Amino acid sequence: MRTQVGIVGAGPAGLTLARLLEREGIDTVVVEARSRSYIEQRVRAGVLEQGTVDLLDDAGVGQRMRAEGLVHHGIVLQVDGERHRLAMSDLTGGRTIVVYGQQELVKDLVAARLASGLRLRFDTECTDLVDLDTDRPRALLREADGTSSELECDLVIGADGFHGVSRQLVAAGSQVFERDYPFAWLGVLAQVAPSCDELIYARHANGFALHSLRSPTISRLYLQCTPDEDLDAWSDGQIWDELQTRLGVSGWTLAEGPILEKGVTPMRSVVAEPMRHGRLLLAGDAGHIVPPTGAKGLNLAIADVAILAPRIIDFLRRSESSGLDDYSDVALRRVWRAQDFSNEMTLMLHSNPDRFEDKRQQARLRYVVSSEAAQRSIAENYVGLQLA
Ligand code: DHB
């Protein structure tokens, strides 16, 4: 097979990039190691920044997101059992976020690609990327039945996530910056109407808890746990009890329902600099991951491809390579802003085994809920700074 741009990974980054390039008449092939049903079902993030929503709309894949996504104008911060609403839209000149599950967005992008009759290979693993320093890089592929093939390209985009082959190849020649956190999230998806119209980020002596949602009938809830937490040690009843404790305020109870899905989300910050090796460019989690607090991961993936798409087009149409040369620097400025924000939100909201840090972060959270200046800073980062 041959194409102009080979895209490894059919997550939000790879599929959105393919869509942006399709609109400009650039030929792409997307290969994905997993099955279609796997990527369309897996429960991931759910908060889209205004800029992400606008980009998806402009790319012609926003109809269902606009119809079914839930627009939010504020979030709630809970400290010492008291709730404080952070009026995001009022603090940011009217900007909002939209709650819409990542897997719903993936479904929309897959449907759009297939409707355009364009190449998208599921169950096709990229085992290696070779000749990256030549003008004919190749992706070596293996299908589920063991058949091998090759995809020859002008450029390869590594959008195959944190565990993919692209990140490993780039990391070998890049600087990698990392930070581990002494916590993780136990997340559940529950078949019950959300108990509050807005997201609640709660700090409690037992640990952080988050009330989120996916639809008027589905709640998404998280509990701070340890990185090596044994999920099997938690019964559904214990999960609900702990959520009630950490999210509880007087006069309010969390509605409970069947748990549809549960998992443990690790927390790490990782950045590869530069996000490039020859003709391989990284986008999304392949290049960087952030801890989940503040919901920046998916939004960064979309921001990467918004920065990358016009640079690829200039390169392929006019042999103009300066855009590709500065892609990493431009994208990483936003990535580091998000690393700082996600790190700050994570530390401020989680109970910390370091007792000094724990006290300091409690003081910070109390300051935030009492200061409009501090709230404005969180709000503008939360709704998303301008793309690029
Ligand atoms: C969700 C995840 C986040 O990391 C966050 O900060 C808010 C909401 C969610 O999955 O709904």
Residue spans for each PLM region:
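Beta1/beta-strand and adjacent pyrophosphate-binding region of the FAD-binding site
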Residues: 1-13
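FAD-binding beta-loop-beta segment adjacent to the flavin cofactor pocket
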Residues: 266-282
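C-terminal helical "tail/cap" subdomain of flavin- and related membrane-associated enzymes
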Residues: 295, 310-388
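Glycine-rich FAD pyrophosphate-binding loop
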Residues: 22-43
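Glycine-rich phosphate/pyrophosphate-binding beta-alpha loops
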Residues: 208, 269-271, 287-298
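Conserved FAD-binding catalytic core of PHBH/FMO-like flavoproteins
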Residues: 111, 118, 124-128, 133-263, ...
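Active-site-adjacent segment of FAD-dependent monooxygenases/related oxidoreductases
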Residues: 41-44, 49-116, 339
